[in-house]
Amino acid sequence: MTMRSPLTNDHPQPLRASPLSEHDDEIQIRLDDSRYRSFPPPRRVVQRNTPAPIQLQDFEFPKQSHDIPGHYPMIDEIYPDVHPYRTSEDGFVSLTNGDNMAQNKRASRSRPWMQNLQTQDRIQRYKKRRPATKWMKWMNSDWKNHIVAVIGELIGTSLFLFFGYAGIEVAKLQGREPPDLEVLFYISATFGASLMVTAWIFFRISGGLFNPAVTLALAILKAVSPIRAFLLVITQLGASCLAAILVQEIFPKQLDVATTLGSGTSMGQGFVIEAITTAALIFTIIMLAVEKHKATFVAPIGIGLALFVAHMVAVPFTGASLNPARSFGPSAIVWNFPREHWIYWVGPILGAGLAVLFFRLIKLMEYEMANPGQDGDPENDPTQNPELDVAQNAHEREEEVLGLSNGKSWYRDDSSSGSMRRKESVNSFTGGRRSMDRRGDIFRRLDDVEAQWRRQQYRNVV
């Protein structure tokens, strides 16, 4: 009879747990069902690693699953990413700790079957694609938002100027010029309605600016970042050229929508008209759209009406640009820039500066306190919402004035009991809805209480 070595045995011995355990039968069922039994060891392979049987005292068996009562998780369920046990050549199960893993990596270079054994099941486990990390980062990046805003501004500005240019072409079909009141009203209504509709559509995407002067004003107010402002200005100029090309190619009449000075209008007069009308338009945008209030969602109506009124005044004298992009497109596609073209750039930019300056002035003077409650919006009313910055500033000023009038310095140590009591009283007061005229009485009473407390402390010390 020929003796066979354990290394050349076609049928390896079944997996056996350690005889030291009291649960050999329960664990043996799981070991016999393990998928690693489907990978028999190769023949005539020299065993380089010393096999180590399972020692249950070094292995903490996991708890039962909550989904299936009485179910013990398999080896793959315990360690889904790392195979903790390998079937050695002689039928034992070896523990794959850090040293054995390093040995297996070295051994896999000379034994390809071992590398396949380590990766075959792992490939099946990773059939489901991992999340696209780069795509997720891109979706959360600022540049993605800039691109969305640029696309919205491109389409919105193109539509706004397309309808405006087309309205001018329709108004001039009978050969009459803007001094005609009907033509003047038609052009003004077309531009005003076009801005109202397109701004209402795109203000949630890009802000619905459609005007480099408006973009500059919002950048000064830090309502738009400098990078986005630059991208939007370039987009608005390109959209004006696109709108002019569409009107020129679609309508049979020759394109005649360029802005020029009216007869008898000097450059200085045209410059002032453009600056004033643009300032009125931008200030309307700031107060209705930038300054949030109860009626912000209907701001496009007021903005469109402001443009309509400005066109009614400025069209006979300057053509009513109020927008550098509106004058740039028709002149750029035919490459014909008149001598007074600078007016339609410098005038609106100056108007934007005037609007921002006036807004900063009234904001510094806290215009909210001049006539509060006009919107019927308690959240933006400083007399009803003490959480507003304006209301808190008023509290601090009044408290400081009352403290100085009583001969006490407001700039005291915060660790003093009087200062802490004052802060607690102010916090309790700001949580209520009391009227503004009662603040003086409240703080005056607090000062009296603090004075009495200090006198009592002095008497105790003496």
Swiss-Prot record:
Regions of this protein lying in the Cytoplasmic compartment: 1-146, 204-229, 291-296, 363-462
Recorded phenotype for the gene knockout or disruption: Leads to a slight reduction in the vegetative growth rate and delayed conidiation.
Keywords, comma-separated and alphabetical: Membrane, Repeat, Transmembrane, Transmembrane helix, Transport
Biased composition regions of type Polar residues, renumbered to the chain: 1-11
Highest rank taxon of the organism: Eukaryota
Gene3D superfamilies, alphabetized: Glycerol uptake facilitator protein
Motif (NPA 1): 211-213
Coiled-coil region(s): none
Keyword Repeat: yes
Residue intervals annotated with topology Extracellular: 168-182, 251-269, 318-341
Induction or repression: Expression is higher in conidia than in vegetative hyphae.
Reactions catalysed according to its record: H2O(in) = H2O(out)
InterPro entries with a match to the protein in the record: Aquaporin-like, Aquaporin_transptr, MIP
Cellular component aspect of the GO annotation: plasma membrane
Family named by the database record: Belongs to the MIP/aquaporin (TC 1.A.8) family.
The record's note on its domains: Aquaporins contain two tandem repeats each containing three membrane-spanning domains and a pore-forming loop with the signature motif Asn-Pro-Ala (NPA).
Protein known as: Aquaporin-1
The species this protein was found in: Botryotinia fuckeliana (strain B05.10) (Noble rot fungus)
Gene name, Swiss-Prot/TrEMBL: AQP1
